[in-house]
């Protein structure tokens, strides 16, 4: 026999929330960088997106294994056939970037049939090459964006009161920074000798003092 509380729950129109979290995958919205936002695939996880873009989600060493890219043999063969150029294209080109890596084009003299030059291919083929090309283009865009939006570091300018203090220290002790450091009347904040040296050097440069 069910309890009174259970009977009330069964009669209630409000159903029990059996699934509090609809999707455990966090819906990530990229707002900080427009290039990453434009190339972000919401169907992939954070790790997969970063790998696709040629970035790393974590700078430290990986604690576990890597996710394997599982494909059928027919898919691999179809991708290789689509990415690999035809023999006729290789015979007509002299650009190493258009010849697959591991192959070469031999150019012979039409009269003597002697080998005049050998062009070794540098083009990477296969699905890995496509992802590498895509990620490298994104990285190039990110580098250009970072260079364009980089903030110029502003040099700190000492105040009039600080200039007056440095002038008093220099007049009293010259370039003896150890004495400046132990001067309890002027060096009330106990600045180190190295810090005083840097401040005095900048002060000298700003006021043309030798």
UniProtKB/Swiss-Prot annotation:
<dbReference type="GO" id="GO:0030687">
    <property type="term" value="C:preribosome, large subunit precursor"/>
</dbReference>
<keyword id="KW-0690">Ribosome biogenesis</keyword>
<keyword id="KW-0539">Nucleus</keyword>
<comment type="similarity">
    <text>Belongs to the NOP16 family.</text>
</comment>
<keyword id="KW-0698">rRNA processing</keyword>
<dbReference type="Pfam" id="PF09420">
    <property type="entry name" value="Nop16"/>
</dbReference>
<comment type="subunit">
    <text>Component of the pre-66S ribosomal particle.</text>
</comment>
<protein>
    <recommendedName>
        <fullName>Nucleolar protein 16</fullName>
    </recommendedName>
</protein>
<comment type="function">
    <text>Involved in the biogenesis of the 60S ribosomal subunit.</text>
</comment>
<dbReference type="GO" id="GO:0006364">
    <property type="term" value="P:rRNA processing"/>
</dbReference>
<dbReference type="GO" id="GO:0005730">
    <property type="term" value="C:nucleolus"/>
</dbReference>
<feature type="region of interest" description="Disordered">
    <location>
        <begin position="1"/>
        <end position="27"/>
    </location>
</feature>
<dbReference type="GO" id="GO:0042273">
    <property type="term" value="P:ribosomal large subunit biogenesis"/>
</dbReference>
<keyword id="KW-0687">Ribonucleoprotein</keyword>
<dbReference type="InterPro" id="IPR019002">
    <property type="entry name" value="Ribosome_biogenesis_Nop16"/>
</dbReference>
């Amino acid at each position: 026999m069910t309890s009174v509380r259970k009977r009330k729950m069964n009669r209630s129109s409000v159903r029990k929330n059996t699934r509090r979290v609809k999707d455990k995958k966090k819906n990530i919205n990229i707002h900080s960088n427009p290039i990453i936002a434009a190339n972000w695939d919401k169907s992939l996880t954070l790790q997969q997106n970063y790998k696709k873009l040629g970035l790393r989600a974590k700078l430290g060493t990986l604690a576990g294994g890597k996710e394997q890219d599982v494909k059928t043999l027919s898919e691999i063969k179809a991708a290789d056939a689509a990415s690999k150029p035809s023999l006729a294209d290789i015979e007509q080109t002299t650009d190493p970037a258009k010849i697959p890596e591991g192959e070469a084009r031999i150019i012979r003299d039409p009269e003597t049939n002697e080998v005049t030059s050998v062009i070794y291919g540098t083009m990477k083929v296969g699905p890995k090459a496509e992802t590498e090309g895509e990620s490298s283009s994104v990285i190039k865009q990110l580098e250009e964006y970072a260079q364009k939006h980089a903030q110029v570091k502003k040099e700190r300018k000492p105040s009039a009161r600080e200039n007056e203090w440095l002038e008093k220290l220099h007049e009293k002790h010259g370039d003896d920074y150890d004495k400046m450091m132990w001067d309890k009347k002027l060096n009330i904040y106990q600045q180190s000798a190295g810090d005083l040296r840097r401040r005095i050097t900048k002060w000298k440069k700003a006021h043309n003092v030798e």
